Amino acid sequence: SKGLMRAHFSEVKKQKEKLKTIISAQTKNRHLGLIRIEFSRFAHRLMDWDNHCASFKHVGDSLKDCGVIIDDNPKIVTQFVPYQFQIKMAEQEYMIIKITDVE
């Protein structure tokens, strides 16, 4: 990944469209209130925590665009918990996003 600051707007658009396609295919859930998000990344190389958290930017925007969450701001996302796990094969990288409604 080229990172958030270095990505050309057309590349960002492609990344978000791909994420929205994946999200739309995997869930029809809607979270209409306060939420907790657990963001787990399984990758060959671990990131610094600031980069790992920043890598959620396009995911959060796509979740909002797909209507899964109403917003990705701190008034709605009351808890954001990042996890990362190192795996052996770069070809098998994936992420898991767990969204829990908060009362």
Model-assigned labels for residue ranges:
Residues 1-103:
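Catalytic phosphate/metal-binding cores of nucleic-acid and nucleotide-processing enzymes, i.e., regions
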